[in-house]
Amino acid sequence: MSSADFNFGDFTTTYTSPTIPAYPDTLGQLQPIQPNPQAAYPPVSQHHASHHVQHPHQPGYVLSNPPQLSGNKRKASDAMSVPPTPGARVMSFEEASRLAAEEDKRKRNTAASARFRIKKKQREQALEKSAKEMSEKVTQLEGRIQALETENKWLKGLVTEKHGSKEDILKLLREFSAHAAKVSKDAAAAAADKAEAAADKADAERAREESSFCVSTSSPSSDESVDTDNKKRRKD
């Protein structure tokens, strides 16, 4: 099937419109916007090209003075490519263990300081509570002392009103002290008598024991004399 079957025209010819003017084809004579890269930049030498094989760049852009980063990167890559020695692995393990020990020590110190702060706070609270209780007890005792002093004054007043002046009270006090001294003296004498009687009794018991001991030691000799007499009589 071809275009002739559908009665289509020939599209290879240029279409010309009577209303649109024709423009000349001068696009091939236009100058390029960017100049020739080979003319703008110097050619790359073989020495620089060998250094920049691993770093491709856009065509026509060559650095006249390459930076020093390439050498540093190469050294870093070489250092990373070298496998670590066993000593380095041991040092790294020791370093890791040391860091772990320091971290554990730091945590334990933190926990200990927290416990110390808690105990200190509890101790301070207990001391404050005990101080408050002691102050309350002191206040109560002071009130009791004042009440006792008031009662003592009241009793003194009653005694002076009943027995007269202070001289009578002093006389009664002297009599009471004399009676108390006499009672204590009698008690001391009775105690001395009891002690002397107990000592005499102990001496008597000791003498009795000594006499019984002497009798028991002398009895075997008399028995022996009796036995010897009986033996002599039998021989005769």
From Swiss-Prot:
All copies of domain bZIP, residue ranges: 99-162
Places the protein is found: Nucleus
InterPro entries in alphabetical order: bZIP (IPR004827), bZIP_sf (IPR046347)
Pfam families tied to this protein: bZIP_2
GO annotations of cellular component type: nucleus
Leucine-zipper: annotated span: 141-155
SUPFAM superfamilies associated with the record: Leucine zipper domain (SSF57959)
Biased composition (Polar residues): 28-37
Expression induction or repression: By sulfur deprivation.
Record's keyword terms, sorted: Activator, DNA-binding, Nucleus, Stress response, Transcription, Transcription regulation
Gene3D superfamilies (alphabetical): 1.20.5.170
Domain of life: Eukaryota
Region annotation Basic motif: where it falls in the sequence: 105-137
Biased composition (Low complexity): 212-223
Family indicated by similarity: Belongs to the bZIP family. GCN4 subfamily.
UniProt-recorded name of the protein: Regulatory protein cys-3
Source species: Neurospora crassa (strain ATCC 24698 / 74-OR23-1A / CBS 708.71 / DSM 1257 / FGSC 987)
GN (gene name): cys-3
